[in-house]
Amino acid sequence: MLTHKNNQGGRKKMQVSFVIRDAEEKRHRNGVNALQLDTINGRLYSAGRDAIIRVWNSMQNNSQEPYIQSMEHHNDWVNDIVLCCGGRNLISASCDTTVKVWNAHKGFCMSTLRTHRDYVQALAYAKDREQVASAGLDKAIFLWDINTLTALTASNNTVTTSSITGSKDSIYSLAMNPSGTVIVCGSTENTLRIWDPRTCNKIAKLKGHAENVKALVVSEDGQHVISGSSDGKIKQWSIGQQRCVQTISVHSEGVWALLMTDNFSHVISGSRDKKIIMTDLRNPTNSVLICEERAPVLSLCYNYDQTGVWATTWNSDIRCWKLNPSEKLSFEVACIKGGAAIKKYHVLNDKRFMLTKDSEMNVAIYDVLKVKKVEDLGKVDYEEEIKKRSQKVYVPNWFTVDLKTGMPTIVLGQDEVDCFAAWVSAEAGLPEHAESGTDPKVNYGSLLLQALLEYWKPPPPHHHLQGVGSDLDSNGCDGDIRGNEYFSVPKHTPIIFSEVGGRNVCRLLVKDAVGETESALLSETVPSWVTNVVIERTIPKFIKLPFYLLAHPSMLKQDRSKKERLIANEFIQCRKVCEHVLEKVLGADLPASTGNSNSSQNNSQSDANSEGSQVPAEERIELLCNDVICDPNMDLRTVRHFIWKQSSDLTFHYRTKSN
């Protein structure tokens, strides 16, 4: 027996991610992995690859809005769901390694179970015992008492679970009979393993499939199992005889979804070949093609009166097909339309904006820094739009992009990509906020983290508690600076704190950080590299770039041919190097009019130098790199990236300009 607490031990490397999305996402933005129907009220629950569980009125006609609500707390694919307790509660399993317990009617997450150490792929439900099992890529199977799960609270967060051991490979399918006397798992071992969940004793191991077992159904009496495999076969097994009774070959590709009639006489199968087929187990040659979907089929579920079957695929639409075994081909009864998934992205050179292309060929522009979509460009040439917006500027990568859910998830970390790497001038990076006459340097990662956690005010340490006469402001705050001085991000933005490698630790919306519970959770979760810039207001380190400075061969004085090695912030512009050459290298030796070799004949040398000092350095000095004249506005890192193009230290040559 394992005792599980809903907390995390041991601090690991953490990363911060957020999703750029609308406040309400009414449509699935990616494939749908699983369905559950509440036959009492006709509510259809769908588990999306966009990390959202949505609830639909399945009895509405196509002209009415079927959307009821969204259930959001996962941050990766939701792989499976089960309705339990007469439809009052729902259990979900996700690639974020968690199992969650929901109030199905109100749509909120009641508790999160973190026992699994890898993707949780499948759930199984024993209705008569109110017991659920979870399994996944960590090869583990856990049994949960649902009544205990639904009673969990913040203070009572300990739950005991039974663990079933023996699986040698990652588990992709799981099934139990209603009375909970048999549990079966299918895995990449290509076998079925069977246990008695009451004792956790092994009953059988059944071999016969050639590939991963992706779908399972157990008969009500626990005597038979139907399995579907990536090998394209459907097999019927006798648990008592521990053998395969028959093999059905009606699909040309893997079988990923199975649905049985109540009397276990017919199997409805959905396949990677996009076909949904009904087969009579008593006469397997009697198979009827119900429909051919537009993409590989992921899950199947009866409609409220079992006259049709709901199907989901790699696409975001959910369709209901009429079940009519007497007809050669069925027809579509209803369709719950999905949205487009973003399939491609390109981060522009300024490392602030990115272009995306979705599954419907629409192109859009996103502002990563301000966490919003800027513009829908429609069905335009994606590559041309990238070229049109290409600039000769180099800013280091400071974030990564993940499109797994179909919506852009931006990841900030301190691992391979440092989120504090991008220092830019406010004039170049935030022109809409830059003030005339000033050009402060800003750090993109620092500004964004401050905006994401703008509503978070950590509880003060006990030894810093304010006493009588303390200096509190009119809002009751102790002078803390919130957010940043430039912008805020949308309040509905989800923020996720996770371990590098995938395990989710904490998820909340930007606006929810103000809550007492959320604030305390953040205090336990937020890594020090984030609190340093958000709370302590530590300024991230500038990145230095070494370079050599030499006189150009065209310069008259050959004694200036020695190499000078300098180190400067990588974002300084070439004009600053020109100023250094003018003031520190050439100094008073440079005449006011550099093109006049007889300038010593001027009436007043001092007057000439005074006049010349008013001329900007870049108009008197020219910088070259690889014999290319550098634009004074170009910064050092851009020169290195576009002109120098070498791993060795950057080298400049300088020369005076002729009039």
UniProtKB/Swiss-Prot annotation:
GO terms for biological process: double-strand break repair via homologous recombination. GO terms for molecular function: ubiquitin binding. WD repeats lie at residues 27-66, 73-112, 115-154, 166-205, 208-247, 250-289, 292-331, 337-376. Pfam families: DUF3337 (PF11816), WD40 (PF00400). Residues 592-613 are annotated as: Disordered. Belongs to the WD repeat WDR48 family. Catalytic component of the Usp12-46 deubiquitylase complex consisting of Usp12-46, Wdr20 and Uaf1; regulatory subunit that, together wtih Wdr20, stabilizes Usp12-46. The Usp12-46 deubiquitylase complex associates with arr/arrow; the interaction leads to deubiquitination and stabilization of arr/arrow. This is WD repeat-containing protein 48 homolog. It comes from Aedes aegypti.
